[in-house]
């Protein structure tokens, strides 16, 4: 089993470029974002004003207490009570605004995730087949699930904390200056130290956050791959090899994850230590000023609170930097996916062909193709197939049989030459219209989680129940379906393991029959079923192929003896063509293949 590709480097991402893309994306949500920012600012302002208001109560309490001790007055509890009620109202408003801001921001972040998932889902349908053949399923799924979730969670928390932290820093600075500029200067001395420490930690943690996200996709790919091929792994006793591969990827994920989390975790204790130093310095200087009557006791209490509040946003900004790193790492992978080159879905309007013109005539004219420029798979393929003919393509593994089908359906485009349908180049059809003309039965059957009725109806979504049942009967599938619990309403599980391989192929054939396409492609359709089921499939397909152009790709040469035309491929070229009898009589490469299979059966 091939291993998924592993990241080869831990170099730093384009952090600034990714943030610019995120900002451009957020510009589509200006109104809810602006509202969330406004309520965040209002909530923070009321919180900031709290210590200053409370200082008046503290000063009134201290003054009244001293006056009471001296016998010159008493504590004005009515005045203090009014202040506390006013303070309570401010904090209630702050909480209300914070709640509204949280509600808006949560909805906004989930809307962003929703839109990203929708864009990814639409993008998948526009990506060329080559993209998926070069990547594991787990890696693609990781971008849709892990990366989008990480992006949404980080977006929700980072924007809120960024706004409140900046607002708090500015507001607290203003309040501190209004109390004592000299004490403010002392408190500000901690800023350069704090910022320097944040920048150092961010610099070292940045590359590990990207490596963590990338390696997580690799681990997901391995888990998905091993789960899908679990039976193969156990049959070949490859558990040890698979475990070793997984451990290698898991170790790499562990290394990048613990380093990124450890470095980000250093910020809080470092910032707390620096903040406490400033707190102690302000407390000492403030007590000296109070003793000399420069400021009141209430102002000292408020200023100390502000110093504590001033260091908190710095700590929060350090956390925001970590969240931004995680968000940018996830966003970069999402944007990379969304920026992948797409297939051209629509043909040139000046030469667009009408899919109604497809009646089954297919011409390959000196087709040349390679998956990479330095590796040509098909060298010079030419052939004309008339409507209604059954064409068999045979040859050893790697001869280019399946590649011809991919070219016919424009999963890939030819490097030179052309493929035409009724004289129209396949590139003159819209891709969706072109593929609607083909019905496929693949060796790797695909059924989704749902009822048997729904799986067959996938061939034509507007088909009635009667039409679905008729298609199942034509595919010789009706009998076994009715013997299953629930019949046509039986629910298939995610990998359709509650029906046999032969039954899966009969269901896919029924789906193809229901689609009623003009051209059929049978790729190894009967290579993995028992003889009795193969006979049922062959009978159903013979009925289906009447009046339709059919391409049959098979290694069992006995299944295509009645083909109107047999194309024998070898190393990307057609070396022989003709009927079965003609090719046997010629005694060439086809005859050798046929006789070797016959000898294997006899042996």
Spans of model-derived segments:
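ABC-type nucleotide-binding domain
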Residues: 346, 355-603
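Hydrophobic alpha-helical transmembrane bundles that constitute the permease/transmembrane domains
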Residues: 41-49, 91-99, 151-154, 158-170, ...
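Helix-loop-helix
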Residues: 64, 175-189, 259-333, 337-338
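Transmembrane helix-loop-helix hairpins at lipid-water interfaces of multipass membrane proteins
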Residues: 33-97, 178-182, 293-297
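An intracellular "coupling" helix at the cytosolic face of ABC transporter transmembrane type-1 domains
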Residues: 28, 129-130, 148-155, 159, ...
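A short amphipathic helical element positioned immediately N-terminal to and/or at the very start
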Residues: 15-30, 140
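Transmembrane helices of ABC transporter permease
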Residues: 28, 32-45, 157-211, 282-295, ...
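Juxtamembrane helix-loop junctions of ABC transporter transmembrane domains
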Residues: 7-15, 38-39, 46-62, 66, ...
């Amino acid at each position: 089993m091939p291993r998924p590709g592993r990241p080869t480097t831990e170099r730093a991402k384009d952090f600034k470029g990714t943030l610019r893309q995120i900002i451009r994306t957020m510009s589509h949500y200006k109104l809810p974002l602006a509202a969330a920012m406004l309520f965040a600012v209002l909530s923070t302002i009321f919180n900031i004003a709290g210590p200053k208001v409370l200082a008046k109560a503290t000063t009134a309490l201290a003054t009244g207490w001293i006056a009471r001790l001296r016998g010159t007055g008493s504590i004005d509890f009515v005045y203090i009570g009014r202040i506390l009620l006013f303070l309570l109202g401010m904090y209630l408003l702050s909480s209300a605004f914070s709640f509204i801001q949280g509600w808006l921001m949560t909805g906004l972040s989930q809307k962003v995730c929703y839109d990203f998932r929708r864009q990814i889902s639409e993008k998948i349908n526009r990506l060329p087949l080559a993209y998926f053949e070069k990547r594991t399923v787990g890696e693609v799924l990781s971008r849709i699930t892990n990366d989008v979730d990480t992006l949404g969670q980080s977006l929700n928390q980072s924007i809120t904390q960024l706004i409140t932290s900046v607002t708090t820093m500015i507001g607290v600075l203003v309040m501190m200056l209004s109390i004592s500029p000299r004490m403010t200067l002392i408190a500000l001395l901690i800023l350069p130290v704090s910022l320097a420490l944040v920048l150092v930690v961010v610099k070292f943690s940045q590359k590990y956050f990207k490596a963590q996200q990338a390696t997580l996709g690799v681990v997901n790919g391995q888990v998905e791959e091993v789960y899908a091929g679990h039976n193969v792994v156990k049959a070949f006793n490859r558990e040890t090899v698979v475990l070793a591969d997984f451990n290698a990827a898991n170790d790499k994920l562990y290394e990048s994850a613990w380093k990124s989390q450890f470095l980000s975790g250093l910020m809080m204790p470092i910032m707390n230590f620096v903040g406490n130093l400033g707190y102690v310095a302000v407390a000492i200087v403030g007590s000296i000023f109070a003793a000399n009557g420069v400021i009141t006791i209430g102002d000292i209490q408020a200023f100390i609170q502000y110093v504590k509040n001033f260091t908190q946003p710095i700590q929060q900004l350090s956390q925001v930097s970590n969240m931004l790193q995680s968000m940018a790492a996830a966003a970069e992978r999402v944007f990379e996916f969304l920026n992948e080159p797409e297939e051209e879905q629509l043909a040139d309007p000046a030469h667009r062909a009408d899919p109604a013109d497809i009646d089954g005539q297919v011409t390959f004219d000196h087709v040349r193709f390679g998956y990479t420029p330095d590796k040509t798979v098909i060298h010079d393929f030419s052939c004309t197939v008339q409507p209604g003919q059954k064409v068999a393509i045979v040859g050893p593994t790697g001869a280019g049989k399946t590649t011809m089908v991919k070219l016919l359906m424009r999963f890939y485009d030819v490097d030179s030459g052309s493929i035409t349908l009724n004289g129209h180049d396949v590139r003159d059809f819209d891709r969706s219209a072109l593929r609607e003309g083909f019905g496929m039965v693949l060796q790797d059957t695909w059924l989704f989680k749902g009822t048997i009725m729904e799986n067959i109806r996938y061939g034509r979504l507007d088909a009635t129940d009667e039409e679905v049942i008729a298609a199942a009967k034509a595919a010789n599938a009706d009998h076994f379906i009715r013997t299953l619990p629930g019949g046509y309403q039986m629910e298939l599980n995610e990998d359709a393991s509650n029906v046999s391989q032969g039954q899966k192929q009969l269901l896919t054939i029924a789906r193809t029959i229901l689609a009623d396409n003009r051209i059929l492609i049978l790729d190894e359709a009967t290579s993995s079923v028992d003889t009795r089921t193969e006979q049922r499939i062959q009978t159903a397909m013979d009925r289906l192929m009447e009046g339709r152009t059919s391409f049959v790709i098979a290694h069992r040469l006995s299944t295509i003896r009645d083909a109107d035309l047999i194309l024998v491929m070898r190393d990307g070229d057609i070396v022989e063509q003709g009927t079965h009898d003609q090719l046997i009589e010629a005694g060439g490469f086809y005859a050798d293949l046929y006789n070797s299979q016959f000898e294997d059966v006899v042996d």
